[in-house]
């Protein structure tokens, strides 16, 4: 059971499937990997892979409770139901802490600044390095 259908959650579910597990994805948004800046080839591949391999994906569904033998979730119509699971992996978003205000020698880069990809992280690090 993977709670969170962002890039990390989808990559975890993909890896679990390749290991012979039976992952289930629960995502609050109306699509998997619903964030800008992610490589279209990667996100399209993962969506197509889950569809072709019949990996259960519950979109617009919220986690209500984690239990010993599964989770309770609520869909967009307000229906609450149980999904059996041996393990639950939380791959959910978070609100970043504003470090910039806490020190003058702090440079926020990468996903801490804005979700992107390896190229945007490297460019951001290069920009900061050139200013030092």
Regions found by a protein language model. Name each.
Residues 18-99:
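A Rossmann-like FAD-binding core segment of flavoenzymes
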